[in-house]
């Protein structure tokens, strides 16, 4: 593996656990305002996930795990098992595409079913949520190592990224943005080009904010400028995250990712997906099986109440698109990298 730098920051945290409550950094307000929302129960956590107070597949899963822990913490003395089961159901409905959500809830549910009293459930579920959070950070650090092995740069390079895959979207450090952090730590990063990522502007509001805070050189660009940047020869790799990866290596990620993969293939630029193995859903054969969330048209027609389009105009607003495995050069997880992904390579990750 690539050598690990001792000069490392895990980045700005997206959540703070206090045992009886979860604090979530309201990412809808960044970069203008840093405001923390207190979630003191599972329903409050679920609402924060739905409303995109917290976003990013790993962070959603971790938040949901803490939500289950809070359900146990605040359960009544009656049918506490029914209360926790209901909390899990509510959390499962908060975002349909991020498989990490269901993976985290299944992990918490296994612990829950092994508990024989409310006190035991309270202690064990809280400990499991913290462990899940710590495991995610460790996975991000491992993914950065594997990604650098795939890239194998012999001099500083520039990369382009999409959406936000940093500490704000994970348990710390980041997935795709964690790779960028590692390049910077090893003095192998020339510059990051960050797509603004319409319509929620995660690139401009979050990625540019994270990188600027951590003194990592970043240039913000309109989504439509990505092709021109690639054509200029400025970037060597496109590095993105994932919300769900299927058994054949197809990837669901933030809308606009598919565009980048097509452009990267045309310009002969490497296209890398970085995500924890919990994002891989081997029960789905291909990207055609992934449910794609669509959100309200107001997210495209306006920004914070300011009209950008005629009132009532029809809007197509899918949150994700699916990039075929045939356009991906490598999928990197904490278990290793799959180059030119296919079903054989994806299965090998789990053997």
Curated annotation (Swiss-Prot):
One of its GO terms (molecular function) is S-methyl-5-thioribose-1-phosphate isomerase activity. Its EC number is 5.3.1.23. Substrate binds at residues 55-57, 95, 202, 253-254. The active site is at residue 243. Disulfide bonds: none annotated. It is an enzyme of class 5 (isomerase). InterPro entries: IF-2B-related, IF-M1Pi, IF_2B-like_C, Initiation_fac_2B_a/b/d, M1Pi_N, NagB/RpiA_transferase-like. SUPFAM superfamilies: NagB/RpiA/CoA transferase-like. Coiled coil: none annotated. Keywords: Amino-acid biosynthesis, Isomerase, Methionine biosynthesis. It catalyses: 5-(methylsulfanyl)-alpha-D-ribose 1-phosphate = 5-(methylsulfanyl)-D-ribulose 1-phosphate. Pathway: Amino-acid biosynthesis; L-methionine biosynthesis via salvage pathway; L-methionine from S-methyl-5-thio-alpha-D-ribose 1-phosphate: step 1/6. GO terms for biological process: L-methionine salvage from methylthioadenosine. The record marks 163 as: Transition state stabilizer. The keyword Isomerase applies. Belongs to the eIF-2B alpha/beta/delta subunits family. MtnA subfamily. Catalyzes the interconversion of methylthioribose-1-phosphate (MTR-1-P) into methylthioribulose-1-phosphate (MTRu-1-P). This is Methylthioribose-1-phosphate isomerase. It comes from Marinobacter nauticus (strain ATCC 700491 / DSM 11845 / VT8).
């Amino acid at each position: 593996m690539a050598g690990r730098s001792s000069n490392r920051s895990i980045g700005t945290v997206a959540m703070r656990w206090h045992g009886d409550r979860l604090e979530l950094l309201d990412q809808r307000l960044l970069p203008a305002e840093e405001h923390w929302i207190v979630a003191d129960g599972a329903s409050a956590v679920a609402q924060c996930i739905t409303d995109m107070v917290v976003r990013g597949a790993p962070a959603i899963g971790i938040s949901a795990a803490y939500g289950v822990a809070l359900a146990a913490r605040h359960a009544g003395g009656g049918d506490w098992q029914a209360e926790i089961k209901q909390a899990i159901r509510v959390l499962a409905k908060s975002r349909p595409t991020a498989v990490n959500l269901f993976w985290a809830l299944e992990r918490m549910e296994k612990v829950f079913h092994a508990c024989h009293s409310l006190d035991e459930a309270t202690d064990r579920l809280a400990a499991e949520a913290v462990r899940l959070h710590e495991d995610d950070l460790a996975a991000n650090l491992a993914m950065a190592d594997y990604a650098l092995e795939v890239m194998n740069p012999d001099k500083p390079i520039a990369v382009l990224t999409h959406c936000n895959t940093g500490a704000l979207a994970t348990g710390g450090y980041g997935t795709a943005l964690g790779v960028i952090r590692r390049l910077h730590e090893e003095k192998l990063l020339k510059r990051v080009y960050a797509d603004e990522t319409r319509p929620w502007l995660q690139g401009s509001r979050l990625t540019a904010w994270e990188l600027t805070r951590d003194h990592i050189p970043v240039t913000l660009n309109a989504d439509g400028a990505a092709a021109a940047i690639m054509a200029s020869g400025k970037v060597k790799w496109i590095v993105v995250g994932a919300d769900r990866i299927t058994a054949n290596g197809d990837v669901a990620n933030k809308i606009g990712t598919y565009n980048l993969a097509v452009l990267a293939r045309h310009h002969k630029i490497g296209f890398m997906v970085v995500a924890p193995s919990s994002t891989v859903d081997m029960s789905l054969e291909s990207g055609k099986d992934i449910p794609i969330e669509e959100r309200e048209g107001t997210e495209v027609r306006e920004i914070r109440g300011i009209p950008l389009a005629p009132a009532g105009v029809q809007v197509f607003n899918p949150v994700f698109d699916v990039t075929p495995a045939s356009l991906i050069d490598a999928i990197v997880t904490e278990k290793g990298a799959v180059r030119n992904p296919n079903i054989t390579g994806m299965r090998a990750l789990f053997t």
